[in-house]
Swiss-Prot record:
Name used for this protein in its record: Na(+)/H(+) antiporter NhaB
GO molecular function terms noted in the UniProt entry: sodium:proton antiporter activity
One Pfam family in the UniProt entry: NhaB
Coiled-coil intervals: none
Record flagged with keyword Iron-sulfur: no
Annotated organism of origin: Shewanella sp. (strain MR-4)
Domain of life (superkingdom): Bacteria
């Protein structure tokens, strides 16, 4: 029986998403105008925010850009907010969009150097605990200067490379042969060519490293202005530069970093939560042979490319630390320098670098549309008022926990943007002092970054890993990710909240003021546009 037009419409709508999900989104689009016009704009606004969080939580069913975008377009169409308010939000956060467009693309052209470094780590260091710590620390360091998504993308590339090499050799082929590493490794008679126990151990080993690296990106990403997109939004609202941001965060981020490293050591040593998988000797030999094979084939031209990438890496770190230009422009300079000196001049080769970041950049623009609704309908007013009624440390802890809980189910860029906007409005209205605003900005930044490792919904890097082609190969499911992240979630969240609740954050911030490491800012500075930052 031929398909009817209505069946064709439902079939095409949101592609391969489950039918119940499609019906849910269509229901949202029908309910929202009714609530807005006949019940209350405030209620309709909150329902929209919850629907948007639902689309983020269901990111594995359908990329949130389409369902979230439809909700945002409708919100503007029915008058929940205006197109000019959405544009204003995007203008205020232009640096973040530039960071995603140019910085992620720039690092794409430095992948060879990063691949080289991570490959050496696995082949040269035999101790599993030491390799885990190195991956965690290397990811943390890189994420402090690069986008976490990019760091995870590189490590995924390393892991896929290793998996395919082992699969190829174990299937009886040499390094240069073509091979489908996604196959189950059976011969023509349907018998297993691969040692099942060896393969399972190797999968476990790769899972461990990827989870340590993923948490490492959160540990490093929270420390600096460019580590995560929401950090840049918070820094712009507070008018902080690179050095000041890192200093202000350090009373929370430094204890958390040490706690994270200790957790990495303990879960590996005690083999808890699925950690402690060893790299089988036979697999290690294959990987070492491959590394030697690659080193032997590396020409002077290839070596020069690595040297250029290393120099550009030094420029990147220096440019960010000294704030020589806006983050996005430094990213653009990285693209120009690496491609010019490494001879990448083909338009299609350049285009590949932008594929990773642009869908997320478009999604971020949709975030800002929902933020515009929150501002116009004053949705967070009552919640913020309740939090601001508490004094001092209690207020900071409430903001940390509120951000943390929401970041576990929703994207932390969205959560951070909403809360910093509300706190800034309270500052402008004279409800809090400028010094308290600065402390709240630290609580919001750490609250959105640290507890969000709990699920792939909160951390874009985790979601990227879960939706990658590698996840099914190494049997990394949503549930397994949440379970393996659990020890980190508990430790990072508790250490973060203790650093704030104990008064350590306030005491250290006062010490930084007294030693002139940072200065007191005025309310007038916060009113200055982000562009002046």
């Amino acid at each position: 029986m031929p398909m009817t037009m209505s069946q064709a419409f439902i079939g095409n709508f949101l592609g391969n998403s489950p039918k119940w999900y499609k019906i849910a989104i269509l229901s949202f689009l029908i309910i929202n105008p009714i609530l807005f016009f006949y019940v209350s704009p405030f209620v309709a606004g909150w329902v929209l925010v919850l629907e948007f969080i639902f689309t983020l939580a269901m990111a594995l069913k359908c990329y949130p850009l389409q369902p979230g975008g439809l909700l945002a377009i409708q919100a503007v169409a029915i008058g929940m907010t205006s197109a000019s308010q959405v544009l204003h939000e995007i203008e205020a956060n232009l640096e973040v969009l530039l960071l995603l467009v140019f910085m992620v693309a720039g690092i794409y052209f430095m992948k060879q150097l990063l691949l080289f470094a991570f490959t050496k780590m696995i082949t040269k260091v035999r101790s599993k605990i030491l390799v885990s710590l190195m991956f965690c620390l290397a990811s943390a360091f890189l994420s402090a200067f690069l986008d976490a998504l990019t760091v995870i993308a590189v490590i995924i590339t390393v892991a896929v490379g290793f998996y395919s090499i082992y699969h190829k050799v174990a299937s009886g082929k040499d390094f240069s042969a073509d091979h489908d590493h996604t196959s189950e490794g059976k011969n023509e008679d349907g018998e297993n060519q691969l040692n099942e126990e060896e393969l399972e151990s190797f999968r476990g080993f790769l899972r461990n490293l990827l989870m340590h690296a993923g948490v490492g990106t959160a540990l490093g990403g929270v420390c600096t202005m460019v580590g995560e997109p929401q950090n840049l939004i918070i820094a712009a609202q507070a008018n902080w530069q690179f050095g000041e941001f890192a200093i202000r965060m350090s009373p929370v981020t430094v204890p958390v970093l040490f706690a994270g490293i200790l957790t990495c050591f303990l879960v590996e040593k005690l083999r808890w939560f699925g950690y402690g998988a060893q790299l089988p000797e036979a697999v290690h030999k294959i990987l070492c042979d491959y590394a030697a094979y690659e080193d032997a084939r590396r020409t002077n031209k290839d070596k020069m490319k690595l040297v250029i990438q290393a120099f550009v890496g030094v420029w990147l770190i220096a440019g960010l630390a000294l704030h020589l230009a806006s983050v996005g422009l430094i990213g653009l300079s990285v693209i120009i320098l690496t491609t010019a000196f490494n001879g990448i001049t083909d338009e299609h080769a350049l285009g590949k670098a932008f594929e990773e970041a642009l869908p997320f950049t478009a999604l971020l623009a949709v975030f800002f549309a929902v933020v515009a609704v929150i501002i116009d309908q004053q949705l967070f007013g009552p919640v913020i008022q309740w939090a601001l009624n508490h004094e001092g440390n209690t207020q900071l802890v409430i903001f940390y926990i509120a951000n943390g809980l929401l970041s576990m189910v929703s994207d932390n860029v969205f959560v951070g943007t909403v809360y910093i906007n509300e706190v800034k409005a309270a500052l402008i209205n004279g409800q809090i002092t400028r010094d308290q605003f600065d402390l709240l900005a630290v609580a919001i930044n750490t609250g959105t970054n640290l507890p969000s490792v709990a699920t792939p919904n909160g951390q874009a890097a985790f979601l990227f890993l879960l939706t990658s082609a590698l996840a099914p190969l190494i049997r990394l499911s949503y549930g397994r990710m949440v379970w393996m992240a659990l020890p980190y979630t508990i430790v990072l969240s508790i250490v973060g909240v203790m650093a704030i609740e104990s008064g350590f954050l306030e005491q250290m911030t006062q010490y930084f003021y007294d030693s002139h490491a940072i200065i007191h800012h005025s309310v007038k500075e916060a009113l200055a546009p982000a562009a002046a930052h």
